[in-house]
Amino acid sequence: MAAKIFCLLMLLGLSASAATATIFPQCSQAPIASLLPPYLSPAVSSVCENPILQPYRIQQAIAAGILPLSPLFLQQSSALLQQLPLVHLLAQNIRAQQLQQLVLANVAAYSQQQQFLPFNQLAALNSAAYLQQQQLLPFSQLTAAYPQQFLPFNQLAALNSAAYLQQQQLLPFSQLAVVSPAAFLTQQQLLPFYLHAVPNAGTLLQLQQLLPFNQLALTNPAAFYQQPIIGGALF
């Protein structure tokens, strides 16, 4: 009897629960979290949500986070594209400054090269004249050091270029200019008197060759001026 009563109560309970139950299929879109009390936290609601809908919710959350950033990303890309010409111009300015610094560092060498440019052109046009000019370069430096003492020879070059060139050709062979510049300058100061006394260019060249060996001209110029010139030699 007691067993029958217990079975009857169980059947009544099952029927009552079946009448009040709500069935949700696995493919339903209605979340279980909507049936939960509102005082539960969002974390508990997300845990109680249908597992099939969780990837969809995650995708919606990612899309909701990306969409506000899309206009900002587009604006930044547009700003970068607009700044590309400025970056290119800045690179050109940096390159120009580097080249300017390089030119300033080598301005001394550049100036020296520009000074020697006429000599390079002379070497290309007339190599013989260029070699002769190179041989006379030490005497040109001596002329720059003593301009007043070499003034008569500059006048000679303006009046008679042929005699001046003959005189300059003999200068590299004069060891006196290398050994004793003072004696060489004394010898050159006596040269205008020979130009007045000797009309013959050949005799003048011989005098130039013998002049470094004439000690009288170096020791006593006054007596040397009074000494006569006989033929092509001077003793």
UniProtKB/Swiss-Prot annotation:
Residues 1-21 form the signal peptide. Keywords: Repeat, Seed storage protein, Signal, Storage protein. The keyword Coiled coil does not apply. InterPro entries: Zein, Zein-alpha. It comes from the Eukaryota. Belongs to the zein family. Zeins are major seed storage proteins. This is Zein-alpha PMS1. It comes from Zea mays (Maize). The gene is ZMPMS1.
